[in-house]
């Protein structure tokens, strides 16, 4: 969604296990679930604005896309051993051929290409990150193109760490699935799975999951109530992290945002997986839209990076969280 009140990157540290000397797992995570908590906040330069998706390409290097000019930006995000972000610098920007409203992006571990989801024309295409030239595209089921609601098409995109699975989702309910989310009820989005045999093989659409989003909780003033899925992140164990984002009018002057991170198990024998809340925050002007895996830290934690696309005059921040209770 093209709303920019500042850009935030969020690093989440993921504990594979609780080891001696580490903080104890919060009580809420007992029983195997994940729980995230804040570590620190970091402020970055204002440009480029409108970042809406992010993916790690190796080391401290990341690619991010914007939803205004169709650019792919290479970022260097440096973290210290504890996971705190030390710096964030834009290294280069490349315009992607024929793109205008980019929302999600995912690094292909087989060939280094970058796959992106475009909200404008409901496509998933691969690009050469050096030239910006389109080199491939995935076959998208017709149900999406025929039923998307304006400005609520493809948002989150992720490729599994092993490179064999890709997932994409629409932001809010398709026309054929009912009403979009509002302050009375949540919506239903479809998470589409693609699989391939290996390097050079085409993505084939396979399973489709129905995911229930939250209703808008903060709409005190009329005219603004939006809730939906903004980002996806596939983990090694078959779990999918789902980033939900709400925008509502809590005052007569300014909108505010709320972010929630859920986990769903795609190994379960159901096309309607149950979701479990692992983190949420009333983020004011920070509009979280993208999420990706980051590096492992010295403590054994795995970081995640989230990017926030707002719209207006908010600060550009980086926020570090820790995610406890890894399965």
Model-predicted segments: where are they?
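Secretory targeting and sorting signals
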Residues: 4-26
């Amino acid at each position: 969604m093209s709303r920019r009140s500042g850009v935030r990157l969020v690093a989440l540290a993921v504990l594979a296990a609780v080891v001696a000397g580490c903080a104890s797992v919060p009580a809420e995570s007992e029983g195997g679930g994940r729980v995230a908590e804040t570590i620190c906040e970091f402020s970055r330069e204002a440009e480029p604005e409108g970042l809406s998706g992010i993916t790690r390409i190796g080391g401290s290097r990341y690619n991010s896309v914007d939803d205004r000019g169709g650019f792919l930006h290479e970022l260097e995000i440096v973290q210290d051993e504890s996971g705190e972000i030390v710096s964030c610098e834009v290294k280069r920007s490349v315009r992607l051929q024929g793109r205008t409203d980019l929302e999600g992006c995912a690094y292909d571990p087989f060939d280094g290409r970058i796959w992106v989801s475009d909200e404008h024309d409901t496509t998933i295409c691969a690009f050469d990150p050096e030239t910006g030239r389109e080199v491939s595209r995935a076959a998208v089921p017709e149900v999406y193109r025929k039923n998307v609601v304006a400005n609520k098409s493809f948002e989150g995109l992720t490729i599994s760490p092993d490179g064999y699975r890709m997932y994409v989702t629409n932001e809010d309910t398709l026309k054929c699935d009912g009403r979009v989310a509002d302050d009375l009820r949540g919506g239903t989005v479809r998470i589409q799975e693609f699989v391939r045999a290996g390097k050079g093989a085409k993505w084939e659409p396979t399973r489709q999951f129905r995911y229930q989003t939250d209703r808008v909780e903060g709409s005190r003033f009329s005219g603004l109530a939006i809730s939906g899925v903004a980002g996806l992140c596939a983990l090694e164990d078959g779990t999918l992290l789902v980033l939900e984002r709400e925008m509502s009018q809590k005052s007569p002057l300014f909108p505010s945002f709320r972010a929630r991170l859920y986990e769903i198990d795609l190994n379960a024998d159901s096309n309607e997986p149950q979701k479990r809340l692992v983190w949420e925050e009333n983020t004011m002007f920070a509009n979280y839209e993208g999420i990706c895996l980051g590096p492992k830290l010295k403590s054994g934690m795995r970081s995640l990076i989230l990017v926030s696309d707002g719209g207006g005059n908010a600060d550009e921040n980086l926020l570090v969280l820790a995610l406890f209770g890894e399965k």
